[in-house]
């Protein structure tokens, strides 16, 4: 199972847009703010973490397929990679739920 199959097209365009500005963001990260603090782009971090979740899902799928085909893969490795992918996906879903809740709370606030 691939995680990026479940990302809506609107989110894909946002994530793609954020990665197109990497040169500007990298310059900001190395130079820092005027106050001397380093700025970090939330979109890039989110994109990297979603890519890591996707990679874990793909690795678990490949390990499972190799085991099914009879390759020299230990059952423990299959179970560990599958559980790691499952837990990382559950964490990503919970983070998404919290972000949606925070967004909805911001929309409910009156100015």
Swiss-Prot record:
The keyword Transit peptide does not apply. This is Flagellar hook-basal body complex protein FliE. PANTHER family: FLAGELLAR HOOK-BASAL BODY COMPLEX PROTEIN FLIE (PTHR34653:SF1), PTHR34653. Pfam families: FliE. It comes from Clostridium acetobutylicum (strain ATCC 824 / DSM 792 / JCM 1419 / IAM 19013 / LMG 5710 / NBRC 13948 / NRRL B-527 / VKM B-1787 / 2291 / W). GO terms for cellular component: bacterial-type flagellum basal body. One of its GO terms (biological process) is bacterial-type flagellum-dependent cell motility. The gene is fliE. Its main location: other. InterPro entries: FliE. It is found in: Bacterial flagellum basal body.
């Amino acid at each position: 199972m691939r995680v990026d199959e479940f990302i809506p097209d609107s989110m894909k365009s946002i994530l793609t847009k954020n990665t197109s500005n990497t040169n500007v963001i990298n310059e900001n990260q190395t130079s820092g703010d005027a106050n001397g603090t380093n700025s970090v782009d939330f979109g890039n971090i989110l994109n990297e973490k979603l890519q890591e979740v996707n990679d874990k899902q793909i690795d678990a799928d490949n390990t499972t397929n190799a085991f099914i085909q009879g390759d020299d893969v230990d059952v423990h490795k299959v179970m560990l990679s599958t559980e790691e992918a499952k837990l990382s996906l559950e964490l990503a879903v919970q983070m998404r739920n919290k972000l949606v809740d925070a967004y909805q709370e911001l929309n409910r606030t009156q100015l």
